Amino acid sequence: MATTVTCTRFTDEYQLYEDIGKGAFSVVRRCVKLCTGHEYAAKIINTKKLSARDHQKLEREARICRLLKHSNIVRLHDSISEEGFHYLVFDLVTGGELFEDIVAREYYSEADASHCIQQILEAVLHCHQMGVVHRDLKPENLLLASKCKGAAVKLADFGLAIEVQGDQQAWFGFAGTPGYLSPEVLRKEAYGKPVDIWACGVILYILLVGYPPFWDEDQHKLYQQIKAGAYDFPSPEWDTVTPEAKNLINQMLTINPAKRITAHEALKHPWVCQRSTVASMMHRQETVECLKKFNARRKLKGAILTTMLATRNFSVGRQTTAPATMSTAASGTTMGLVEQAKSLLNKKADGVKPQTNSTKNSSAITSPKGSLPPAALEPQTTVIHNPVDGIKESSDSTNTTIEDEDAKARKQEIIKTTEQLIEAVNNGDFEAYAKICDPGLTSFEPEALGNLVEGMDFHRFYFENLLAKNSKPIHTTILNPHVHVIGEDAACIAYIRLTQYIDGQGRPRTSQSEETRVWHRPDGKWQNVHFHCSGAPVAPLQ
């Protein structure tokens, strides 16, 4: 009888050291190859937690990274599978993000921006020559090899990269990062290598003035701007940029991908290949200051996500008021959170001032040079980014990388099912509620005084004696729904829930709870197996 030999090559050949990054199913650690003493970054993926599709994506990423051997790309040196884990051994890049390095420089000019984009284009050209489209070019994926002056720019994170044949155009799914998405992707048309050039155009624009060409606090409006190619070169900051630099941006941000400049052509553009005579050598202090603010906002992604309203606002139950309206109390609470986020941002961004002549409400953050809107604040999610690791993390930001369609659809499914469950609660419909919940549902909630409750009887009491007898309108608003997909058939959602209702004296009230629900799909149908509720009781008892 044959015995299975477990591979231990990584364990035998490498010594692991400290963590340098984390992802959803992985950790990145510094490691040393024992026989040479050379340092690397080991991306360690827990394969026990991966679905079959996740395995395919891992294999695709490793296959693509093995193809790419270029001085401006983070190189994969080894790919090793052991029992329960897969190890990807990459270059150890220690210089941090390119954009962070720029703001620390004493001198920064158009010529420096030209040198940066040249290295990025060299990396993109190599990818395209090897039949690879990156699909997620953005500042977070542009690293420096070391902290030495003049260190090479390195393109990282090929988690969304795809393989194409020649100049093949096809629909490969909706993936990328909102502010850097091309018009053809937003129109859901066939696409290919030109999407990377569009993203290079966005990056070059930021490199020259410190803010993005497309931005809006409303993602739909942001997408409309991109599809229309609606950007400009406003005074006074663009007055000092050479016409050649603007010309290259225009050729990169050409709406028609067939007419868009290629990486090979862009490298031959005078502003790139003749920078010493064409690009301006003037120090761009205003660009550095704007870039500092741009970077500060990217780093404050987490603070914004926990305070900004998500776009999901829905009404359920016996509602007699206008749909999707908020009570003054609820509105005041959320506006306060937004103002706190703005205050924090402005302190971190060296006193950025919102534009005062804006006609938008006080919670909007305006002016591309001063206070950028939420859509422009982040590095541009996957709701998942770890600069070292390239694993995508989950968030609702405009600067986050968008996931592949299947993961996105699954998250929407979880949010919709959660809405249905809350609707059943507000309607006092225990039968509908029980269909969505596992019979062995466990929960921690204020009504149980901190005790773990198992089964449906505890909840049935509230349905039969309170909820089913309530004839007054109830309106629920979900804020910041945050879904973590756990394999193919499990997920967790966390959100803030505002419940508006009329109390016994006929006065409008609002209660807030913070909730987490764990969902499982045993037979193709999602069921709530556990939930944790903090804050005020879900059922308004007044």
Curated annotation (Swiss-Prot):
GO terms for biological process: activation of meiosis involved in egg activation; apoptotic signaling pathway; calcium ion transport; cell differentiation; cell projection morphogenesis; cellular response to homocysteine; G1/S transition of mitotic cell cycle; hippocampal neuron apoptotic process. CDD domains: STKc_CaMKII. The modification Phosphotyrosine is found at Y17. Residues 283-292 are annotated as: Autoinhibitory domain. SUPFAM superfamilies: NTF2-like, Protein kinase-like (PK-like). Residues 354-369 have a biased composition (Polar residues). Residues 14-272 form the Protein kinase domain. ATP binds at I20, G21, K22, G23, A24, F25, S26, V27, V28, K43. It catalyses: L-seryl-[protein] + ATP = O-phospho-L-seryl-[protein] + ADP + H(+); L-threonyl-[protein] + ATP = O-phospho-L-threonyl-[protein] + ADP + H(+). Transmembrane segments: none annotated. The modification Phosphothreonine is found at T287, T306, T307, T400, T401. Its main location: membrane. InterPro entries: Ca/CaM-dep_prot_kinase-assoc, Kinase-like_dom_sf, NTF2-like_dom_sf, Prot_kinase_dom, Protein_kinase_ATP_BS, Ser/Thr_kinase_AS. Induction: By cocaine in cardiomyocytes. One of its GO terms (cellular component) is neuron projection. Gene3D superfamilies: 3.10.450.50, 6.10.140.620, Phosphorylase Kinase, domain 1, Transferase(Phosphotransferase) domain 1. Residues 349-376 are annotated as: Disordered. GO terms for molecular function: ATP binding; calcium/calmodulin-dependent protein kinase activity; calmodulin binding; identical protein binding; phospholipase binding; protein homodimerization activity; protein kinase binding; protein serine kinase activity. Residues 291-301 are annotated as: Calmodulin-binding. It is an enzyme of class 2 (transferase). PANTHER family: SERINE/THREONINE-PROTEIN KINASE (PTHR24347). CAMK2 is composed of 4 different chains: alpha (CAMK2A), beta (CAMK2B), gamma (CAMK2G), and delta (CAMK2D). The different isoforms assemble into homo- or heteromultimeric holoenzymes composed of 12 subunits with two hexameric rings stacked one on top of the other. Interacts with SYNGAP1, CAMK2N2 and MPDZ. Interacts with FOXO3. Interacts (when in a kinase inactive state not associated with calmodulin) with ARC; leading to target ARC to inactive synapses. Interacts with CAMK2N1; this interaction requires CAMK2B activation by Ca(2+). The CAMK2 protein kinases contain a unique C-terminal subunit association domain responsible for oligomerization. This is Calcium/calmodulin-dependent protein kinase type II subunit beta. It comes from Rattus norvegicus (Rat). The gene is Camk2b.
